[in-house]
């Protein structure tokens, strides 16, 4: 689909640029894995078509709930695709005090399904805002959410305790996962108790 756009553009002008997005605009967590999946083909086709000007957006829709620095993994990935191949693990550690793989853990509160890197979803947001007494018939709550969120909180806890100016990112995601380990299934538990 990207090549078709460039073919159309070339009929109109020789001067064009590319604007892509680092996904952080649908909830509290970034979507670095989805950004990587969606930007790889886009950047490859842009480079093949000789695009020189490239812009990366990180919109703050819905109150800019996800932290601006939570997309550092996306920025490093896109940098590597675009112009500089470097060891992402080491560079991320030098830059933030966290390895690249550790930074990708910021996505965890929205990763409840095996396919989440393919479709951006925001269960952490809708589960947090769900009224546990009224429920929401469009929200499907699974019993295993409690287990997922407990596991996520356990993974995020030591990362939140590291000495780094970016540790607040992990504290926020840990606290969100920890809270959701209780709240995500509370409506089911209340219903069953009733």
Region spans (language model):
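Substrate-binding groove of N-acetylhexosamine-processing glycoside hydrolases
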Residues: 1-194
């Amino acid at each position: 689909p990207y090549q078709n756009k460039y073919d159309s553009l070339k009929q109109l002008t020789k001067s064009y640029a590319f604007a892509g997005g680092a996904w952080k605009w649908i909830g509290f967590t970034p979507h670095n894995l989805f950004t990587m999946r969606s930007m790889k083909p886009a950047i490859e086709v842009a480079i093949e078509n000789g695009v020189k000007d490239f812009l990366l957006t990180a919109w703050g829709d819905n109150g800019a709930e996800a932290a601006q620095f939570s997309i550092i993994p996306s920025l490093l990935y896109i940098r590597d695709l675009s112009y500089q191949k470097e060891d992402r693990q080491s560079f991320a550690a030098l830059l933030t005090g966290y390895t690249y793989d550790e930074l990708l853990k910021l996505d965890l509160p929205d990763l409840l399904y095996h396919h989440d890197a393919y479709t951006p979803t925001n269960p952490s947001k809708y589960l947090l805002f769900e009224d546990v007494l009224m429920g929401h018939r469009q929200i499907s709550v699974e019993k295993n959410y409690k287990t997922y969120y407990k596991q996520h909180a356990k993974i995020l806890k030591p990362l939140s305790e590291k000495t780094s100016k970016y540790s607040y990112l992990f504290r926020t995601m840990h606290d969100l996962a920890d809270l959701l380990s209780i709240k995500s299934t509370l409506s089911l538990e209340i219903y069953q108790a009733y």
